[in-house]
From Swiss-Prot:
Gene Ontology annotations of biological process type: arachidonate secretion; cell-cell signaling; central nervous system development; feeding behavior; grooming behavior; neuropeptide signaling pathway; phospholipase C-activating G protein-coupled receptor signaling pathway; positive regulation of calcium-mediated signaling
Gene: NMUR2
Similarity comment: Belongs to the G-protein coupled receptor 1 family.
Disulphide bonds in the chain: 119-204
Carbohydrate-modified residues: 9, 27, 194
Tissue expression from the record: Predominantly expressed in the CNS, particularly in the medulla oblongata, pontine reticular formation, spinal cord, and thalamus. High level in testis whereas lower levels are present in a variety of peripheral tissues including the gastrointestinal tract, genitourinary tract, liver, pancreas, adrenal gland, thyroid gland, lung, trachea, spleen and thymus.
UniProt topology in membrane: Multi-pass membrane protein
InterPro entries (UniProt xref): GPCR_Rhodpsn, GPCR_Rhodpsn_7TM, NeuromedU_rcpt, NeuromedU_rcpt_2, NMU-R2_C
GO molecular function: G protein-coupled receptor activity; GTP binding; intracellularly calcium-gated chloride channel activity; neuromedin U binding; neuromedin U receptor activity; neuropeptide receptor activity
Species the sequence originates in: Homo sapiens (Human)
Ranges per topology, Cytoplasmic: 71-82, 147-165, 236-265, 323-415
Keywords: Cell membrane, Disulfide bond, G-protein coupled receptor, Glycoprotein, Membrane, Receptor, Transducer, Transmembrane, Transmembrane helix
A single Gene Ontology CC term: membrane
Protein name: Neuromedin-U receptor 2
Length: 415
């Protein structure tokens, strides 16, 4: 992706290896620019843009809903959900700032119009959100590991304040580790053989020796993908063994632990989240490592790189849009909270466009069922209490309490 210091028109790599005498056949500045930088507009602009539009819409709406659900509903403010909130913020930054910039650069690859500051910001943004995403995924996996294998320690240590401190460290480290790659980028200008500046040739690219860039990419791919994915895989394997052991003990003793189905549900959701994350980010890191390891480019290698480059971009942005869908499909609590937020917006819209509607018709009926843990929402049913609310989940429940809330929205005289 262009947002990931990659060039949208990788075909120029092979073109640059042509003999210098070819340059004398170039009859215009535009032809000379195309020779140096590749086509001004990517050949993939139209099909990729068509794919990006639904990803953008679904991703922005979904991640905004995730943020609203966690911010507005006290019952959703759990340590685990705070890490998911961090992931949603990271995804929103990618979709709102990164995707439009990449689409623009595919439409007009040069000149880069935002100057050195814009170049630094673009590089730092993508590096930071990449690192913050994988660190958030790793942190929530460690939290679940502690909750499953050391539940008493988790009850004492897993607090919202601690989660916020950890997230501060995560984002601080992400910004810090983005600096090396950012520092080697800048605006590059091209010149005619006589030394005069080629108009409109400014590009945001690597301006330091390529071996530095290659080294940074290889180190960060190991530290922020291969190593975390290995650690996460080991953690989920150990969690699976523990849950299997607990199930066997319960079968032997004839006791059913009501928390086990809930933990299994949450672990299933987080496991799917990690699996999708790993699959979607694999092409991105393959793309980066491909570019960093190849020293002698050929036409066939450039063609393969172009294909990998486009696929990696689609999967990268897809990972930012799919998380809210996973929450909605695998977590009844998130599903109910999403419906509650949407109903709240629907109620406000009705209030503005139909002010004569009686207030009683704009209430949301909430059925509260107290259960095991705020993020663990599948298990036996408990007696329920019904009450009338406007739009918020009950605020009296603490993160250590275990509750379950189902929501049903009613409009009594539907128009």
């Amino acid at each position: 992706m262009s947002g990931m210091e990659k060039l949208q028109n990788a075909s120029w790599i092979y073109q640059q290896k042509l003999e210098d005498p070819f340059q004398k056949h170039l009859n215009s500045t535009e032809e000379y620019l195309a020779f140096l930088c590749g086509p001004r507009r990517s050949h993939f602009f139209l099909p990729v843009s068509v794919v990006y539009v639904p990803i953008f819409v679904v991703g922005v709406i979904g991640n905004v809903l995730v943020c609203l659900v966690i911010l507005q509903h006290q019952a959703m403010k759990t340590p685990t959900n705070y890490y998911l909130f961090s992931l949603a913020v990271s995804d929103l930054l990618v979709l709102l700032l990164g995707m439009p910039l990449e689409v623009y650069e595919m439409w007009r690859n040069y000149p880069f119009l935002f100057g050195p500051v814009g170049c630094y910001f673009k590089t730092a943004l993508f590096e930071t959100v990449c690192f913050a995403s994988i660190l958030s995924i790793t942190t929530v996996s460690v939290e679940r590991y502690v909750a499953i294998l050391h539940p008493f320690r988790a009850k004492l240590q897993s607090t919202r304040r601690r989660a916020l401190r950890i997230l501060g460290i995560v984002w601080g480290f992400s910004v810090l580790f983005s600096l090396p790659n950012t520092s080697i980028h800048g605006i590059k200008f091209h010149y005619f053989p006589n030394g005069s500046l080629v108009p409109g040739s400014a590009t945001c690219t690597v301006i330091k020796p390529m071996w530095i860039y290659n080294f940074i990419i290889q180190v960060t791919s190991f530290l922020f993908y291969l190593l975390p994915m290995t650690v996460i895989s080991v953690l989920y394997y150990l969690m699976a063994l523990r849950l299997k052991k607990d199930k066997s003990l319960e079968a032997d003793e004839g006791n059913a632990n009501i928390q086990r189905p809930c933990r299994k549900s949450v672990n299933k959701m987080l496991f799917v989240l990690v699996l999708v994350f790993a699959i979607c980010w694999a092409p991105f890191h393959i793309d980066r490592l491909f570019f960093s390891f190849v020293e002698e480019w050929s036409e066939s290698l450039a063609a393969v790189f172009n294909l990998v480059h486009v696929v990696s971009g689609v999967f990268f942005y897809l990972s930012s849009a799919v998380n809210p869908i996973i929450y909605n499909l695998l977590s009844r609590r998130f599903q109910a909270a999403f419906q509650n937020v949407i109903s709240s917006f629907h109620k406000q819209w009705h209030s503005q466009h139909d002010p004569q509607l009686p207030p009683a018709q704009r209430n949301i009926f909430l059925t509260e069922c107290h259960f095991v843990e705020l993020t663990e929402d599948i298990g036996p049913q408990f007696p329920c209490q019904s009450s009338m609310h406007n739009s918020h989940l009950p605020a009296a429940l603490s993160s250590e309490q275990m509750s379950r809330t189902n929501y049903q929205s009613f409009h009594f005289n539907k128009t």
